[in-house]
Amino acid sequence: KGHLAPYASVDFNYKSSAETFAMSNIALQNSGLNRKAWRSLENHIRNWTHEKGRLVVVTGPIFNKLPKKVKHISVPSAFYKVIYAPKHKRFLGFVFPNTDISARQIWDYAMPVEAVEKQTGYTFYSSLSRRKQAHKTSTDPEWWKRRDIA
């Protein structure tokens, strides 16, 4: 299983931290994905909050039309994370298949938020102006990898 919002990232107060253990925050996630690529991305996101300022992160599962089930519980075919750095007007998206993926491979799954929207059917950050939303069509992994952003 995997937590969609990790306990280590939700430290606003006791109630918020405790809510990370609610069933609504848990999905059946491949253990190799959870311990490797997913954990690596979560660590990057925590570091980015120090390097790039406040981030707005949306996470969720993606299900096939006829999902595999384990004990009557649907297993996601993939998981997504979309990230917005408001101070810099930068967006980044990821979709990981629900399989074993190494931490070194996370950038192979980076994509524009617009591509994540197409895969999920969701519109992310819809309250932003059209001008800001226009940035969802591109991504710059090298910018996110840099550590000198303030």
Spans of model-derived segments:
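Domain-level detector of nuclease and nuclease-like folds
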Residues: 1-150
